[in-house]
Amino acid sequence: MRHSYRGRRFNRTAEHRKAMFANMSAALIKHEQIVTTLPKAKDLRPVVEKLISLGRTDSIHARRLAMAQIRDADMVKKLFTVLGPRYQSRPGGYCRIMKAGFRYGDNAPMAVIEFVDRDVDARGKDSGPTAVETADAA
């Protein structure tokens, strides 16, 4: 019986799961909408909601806690300067999950996880050219 087991393992080690959710959290904060499998989206939502609740109180301690979770300085900055003030008056429920059909290769259920009141222009926005691309252009 699997009574009182919280979360899913996703056939990954604990370190791999932690890194996966850190990367997915950073991607969601960056693009404000990502497409992933439904179980991953369901497990990602509480992680991101707690981060946004941290972002509502801008303090050094909260920034360090967020940095330990996300591990991306630019996304922590966006969390505290853009997302925190945006959801200051909302008591919770910062993300929504919408089902998006099934993946072609393995028929896995897919979902779109996005922020409520999201910035539509942030979707698909890249961080800019990399050092390799600028070296190739020169």
Curated annotation (Swiss-Prot):
Keyword Ribonucleoprotein among record annotations: yes
Domain of life of the native organism: Bacteria
GO biological process, one term: translation
InterPro entries in alphabetical order: Ribosomal_bL17, Ribosomal_bL17_sf
A Pfam family reported for this protein in Swiss-Prot or TrEMBL: Ribosomal_L17
Keyword annotations: Ribonucleoprotein, Ribosomal protein
Alphabetical list of SUPFAM superfamilies matching this protein: Prokaryotic ribosomal protein L17
Keyword Ribosomal protein: yes
Gene Ontology molecular function, alphabetical: structural constituent of ribosome
GO CC annotation, single: cytosolic large ribosomal subunit
NCBIfam families in the record: L17
PANTHER family xrefs: LARGE RIBOSOMAL SUBUNIT PROTEIN BL17M, RIBOSOMAL PROTEIN L17
Assembly notes: Part of the 50S ribosomal subunit. Contacts protein L32.
Family: Belongs to the bacterial ribosomal protein bL17 family.
Record's protein name: Large ribosomal subunit protein bL17
Organism per entry: Methylorubrum populi (strain ATCC BAA-705 / NCIMB 13946 / BJ001)
Native organism taxonomy: Bacteria, Pseudomonadati, Pseudomonadota, Alphaproteobacteria, Hyphomicrobiales
Gene for this chain: rplQ
